Amino acid sequence: MNMTQIAPRYLGLLLALPLAAGTVRIIQTNSAGDNVSIIDPVTNKVVGEIRGIEVNHGAAAAPDGSRYYVSNEGNSTLDIADVKTLKVTKSIPLTGHPNNIAISKDGRRVYVSIAVAPGAVDVIDTTSQERVKTIPVKGAVHNTYVTPDGKFVVSGSIASKTITVIDQKTEEPVWSLTMDLGIRPLAFAANPDGSTKWIFVQLSALNGFAVVDFATHMEIQRIKLPELPAGKAKFLVGGNESHGMAVTADGKTLVVNSRLNSSIYFYSIPDLKLMGGTEVGKSPDWVTLTPDGKTAYVACAASNFVSVVDIKSMKEVTRIPVGEVPKRNITAVLP
């Protein structure tokens, strides 16, 4: 039985149990419902829910383990939930309809993609729990990220086909790149010193990804994902063919979703050679990895489950039923 079907009193008993230091949780938003699923990657079971967030989209976790942040598309707010009780404690009004979100390394700022023209990233101070700034960018923003070194905020726009890079300290744009197709999810490769080397870019109508050199601000490579074997039917996705990427913590593997193929693929870094892939559920929309880099959790939007994939064997090991139309997910480490 799915955890979401268990009587609330039993969920309450589970939530009352203290979390061990270093507990990992997969936070899975369900965009067609009002619930966010909390997954334990040890048991691969749903162990709790955040309820009452209309059309929940992006998620982030406070580094101190106290709060979850979820963008609420229905009400155009950033909702804050207590990690222990999973209750929403505050809703912060935004300047427009939000999409994905990101949190600064110190947890003091949440950056919210505003997915309406002319385009902006809202800045939320997590101490005052208020919007303190809006950063104008070119085009409605689909996704926003903080680079692994914490120095930059990077947004991408489908409409304007533009990546905007923002200095995290000044919260001002420092460079941008307009490409030939709409900007979908991003991921990052690092230099040996931890600084950002490349941006991996998924693009509208491309079953693959581009590589942008962070230093030169130029596209240097474009890679197409494998074609399906003969007899396998493509999944019709309306031009959004590849959506969701992640890089393992050791920086050696790029995991790439293909909505068109209902599969995920694994590429070595830095040579970007295909190592393998596996079929998952329909319309894999996002992917997050465990901190040890051993397991991928793939949100399958058209199947209403999360595919769990062992990265070493590149095989799906189980499926976790969640809510309706699961999309964005993150990995939270609760100290």
Predicted regions and their residues:
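Leucine-biased recognition of intrinsically disordered, low-complexity hydrophobic segments
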Residues: 11-19
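Predominantly soluble domains enriched in secretory-pathway, periplasmic, or organellar proteins
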Residues: 18-335
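Bacterial N-terminal signal peptides that target proteins for export
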Residues: 1-12
